[in-house]
């Protein structure tokens, strides 16, 4: 696959276990997501190990800081050679624009830069608790529009918002969707969920899937089944 749609979320606190899992799967069938826990534990060298094995990496650190600090963190991710990196859209348009501008010298080699809208664990009551009275979907659209205006490549959003965002922001604006569960798997702590085929049909470009793959006895088979369902 030239452009694998599945991004496997790695959530390990043991390096040997993580690499043992990675060695069971084929880099042509998926990409890998490294988040805050693993990056804090194992650092940039872990990402380099994944690159050595041929994997594209989504560095999911959700940077959110003043424009100068955030953009320098994004540049550091580009230097590491990751495929995708993200920032919190709620950091504002100036922060996002600075992060996009700092990637210009990398040309076609630059990572995709993605905004994080509303975390998939958040519901209306959670938003109200931080002073946002809009419905989650309305707030997602507001932040996604801000992200596009800042020149970013797309957003992380739940599959429920995908068709709305494609309609408002265009086909080229990339949608990265967590909360994906293959049919029959546990819901876990993601509140707003959908199957892989449903998510792609709704307009998602990339699907973040964790435990249904990482905890499977035969992850390569699960990946094959998911990819087949997307054809």
UniProtKB/Swiss-Prot annotation:
One of its GO terms (biological process) is 'de novo' pyrimidine nucleobase biosynthetic process. Catalyzes the decarboxylation of orotidine 5'-monophosphate (OMP) to uridine 5'-monophosphate (UMP). InterPro entries: Aldolase_TIM, OMPdecase, OMPdecase_AS, OMPdecase_bac, OMPdeCOase_dom, RibuloseP-bd_barrel. The keyword Transport does not apply. Homodimer. The active site is at residue 62. GO terms for molecular function: orotidine-5'-phosphate decarboxylase activity. Its EC number is 4.1.1.23. NCBIfam families: PRK00230.1, pyrF. This is Orotidine 5'-phosphate decarboxylase. Substrate binds at residues 11, 33, 60-69, 120, 181, 190, 210-211. Pfam families: OMPdecase (PF00215). Pathway: Pyrimidine metabolism; UMP biosynthesis via de novo pathway; UMP from orotate: step 2/2. One of its GO terms (cellular component) is cytosol. Signal peptide: none annotated. It catalyses: orotidine 5'-phosphate + H(+) = UMP + CO2. Belongs to the OMP decarboxylase family. Type 1 subfamily. It comes from the Bacteria. Keywords: Decarboxylase, Lyase, Pyrimidine biosynthesis.
